[in-house]
């Protein structure tokens, strides 16, 4: 088990789905976690109950991260509750597939403001707290005998692979990948690691809403490994990147997709649509 004992972590968009899986897995590894959500209050409460049952501290913060000041407020409130911040996991996001001819300015701005702009401004605000944490734990955040703090951005295979109807969503993920590289270079001197996780298809409730049997079969058929991924699998990778084990690993974009971006599955029926 990865050791996150005494780690203080904020996970945005963690009331449900992949974010909830990340938050609960971090808690299993010993971290205290702030769960951010906007609409999924019932699911967020359930996530909090799981974290508390594991013996870890947890606070729920409701906010609309499409608003820049709410990004700042959320990060500050998380750090205040936890008593500092060791890691930020940027996970908040939405996808609304649309053909390019049907995309208007409101649709574009709605997705970009949450999927990318919130990552930027949450990270910007978190840096202040991560530096303070480094000074508290090591006496100097530039102390290279100290493993440092971490920012983990949740991207997607769509940052690398094209898919019909995802021109805006995929563009946000490409932006996240570029931002991760740039911010990593900028923050290395401050002893803050920045990495991204790019999941493929992950088993979450929304994925099976329309037709559980068809979607599961279709999703599994796309993946060379033969199945879709699980939220906790993304969670354990996030835990590794938030842990001291990843000290010498800044600026990486790690795909966790069952081989989707590495191989063409010749058994996939390309006439099917998700």
Where would I find each of the regions flagged by the language model?
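Active-site helix of classical SDR
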Residues: 123, 172, 180
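Alpha-helical segment proximal to the catalytic Tyr-Lys
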Residues: 128, 185-189, 247
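Short C-terminal tail/terminal secondary-structure segment
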Residues: 3, 161, 250-274
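Substrate-binding pocket helix/loop in short-chain dehydrogenase/reductase
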Residues: 99-100, 104-112, 219
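Residue(s) in the substrate-gating loop at a strand-loop-helix junction
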Residues: 156
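Conserved glycine-rich cofactor-binding loop
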Residues: 15-17
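Active-site loop immediately N-terminal to the catalytic Tyr-X3-Lys motif
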Residues: 101, 147, 161-167, 189, ...
